């Protein structure tokens, strides 16, 4: 990205422009040609750019989350339990992506989502609010759906759709919101 290199940080409306440029770079990833999640960058909940290469060698659960959904309490509780049980011993990583596409159940901004996550004692990584369906869907989510299609259609049907990604960055399983996170344990064992 030498085109954008500069000795001084560049700000746009008070935000460091590297995050914007990185998001633009992620948009340029052809999700149909991508082989692993490591080819993507995302913004974390604080707006910092994160290369998913940081998850190399880890089994991951990637999930779209919402704070005002009927599944919220159970899923956050069980995702935290899975993380506590396996993050140190097995290297499990959980990536939560807030999404407001289903019943407007994640209406707040990132600051409000952070406050909610703090109240829920979320101990896994949280990312910027994204679209998971449609023309504005984040390329990572297009990739996940492309690699692990859904029943009838590949689209995400509701909040708390979960993907298991193996240690090589390849999506290997997909679960709908009716599948409780604790029910993923048996399948996770295949990938440690």
Residue ranges of model-derived segments:
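Thiol-/selenol-based redox modules, centered on thioredoxin-like
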Residues: 139-142, 146-192
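N-terminal mitochondrial targeting presequence
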Residues: 1-25
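Thiol-based oxidoreductase modules, predominantly thioredoxin-like and allied folds used
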Residues: 88-108, 123-134
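Conserved helix-turn-beta segment immediately C-terminal to the redox Cys motif
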Residues: 58-59, 67, 73-97, 118-121
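Short, internal strand/loop/helix patches
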Residues: 111-159
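N-terminal "domain-start" segment that seeds a small globular fold
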Residues: 21-53, 74-75, 139
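Amphipathic alpha-helical repeat scaffolds
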Residues: 44-45, 64-68
